[in-house]
């Protein structure tokens, strides 16, 4: 929720519709600041690659012994050939588009380093109408 309030200006500039249905508090084993960095990265990327209905949907789902956080945005799916390289430092799928907003290509490599440092899972999934990035955290 804090990430969304810090990004409020960007959300309004992009005319995005952000959907975040709060659930009951979930307690996890994680570094608060590093987790916030991952969410910020995912939401920022979602806003930069927003298209179509301009929807960004954030979900926090309770699983058996984990919590799964997903950030979905409407837009063009990422080409399958690019998916394995997304987590590499300085990798950019669409260089021209990234130049428009000044992206450096290091955001997802930071996500990778944080999640691997916490021994957690992370990933991306294409849908017909957009892309979803996700990560998991162990529950307390």
Residue positions per predicted region:
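Conserved catalytic submotifs in the C-terminal HATPase_c
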Residues: 12, 17-26
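A residue-level detector for a conserved hydrophobic packing site
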Residues: 35-36
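Short helix-loop "hinge" at the ATP-lid/N-box region of the Bergerat-fold HATPase_c
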Residues: 46-47
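Conserved glycine-rich
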Residues: 52, 119-120
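Short beta-strand/loop element within the Bergerat-fold HATPase_c
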Residues: 53-65
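Short conserved segment of the HATPase_c
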Residues: 78-92
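Short alpha-helical Gxxx[C/S/T] motif in the catalytic ATP-binding
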Residues: 102, 107, 111
């Amino acid at each position: 929720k804090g990430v969304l309030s810090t990004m409020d200006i960007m959300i309004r500039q992009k005319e995005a519709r952000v959907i975040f249905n709060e659930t009951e508090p979930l307690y996890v084993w994680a570094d608060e600041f590093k987790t916030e960095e991952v969410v910020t990265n995912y939401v920022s990327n979602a806003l930069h690659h927003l298209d179509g209905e301009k929807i960004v949907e954030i979900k926090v789902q309770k699983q058996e012994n984990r919590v799964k956080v997903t950030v979905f945005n409407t837009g063009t799916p990422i080409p399958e050939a690019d998916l394995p390289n997304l987590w590499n430092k300085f990798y950019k799928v669409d260089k021209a588009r990234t130049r428009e907003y000044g992206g450096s290509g290091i955001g997802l490599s930071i996500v990778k380093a944080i999640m691997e440092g916490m021994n957690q899972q992370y990933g991306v999934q294409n849908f017909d109408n957009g892309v979803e990035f996700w990560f998991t955290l162990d529950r307390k």
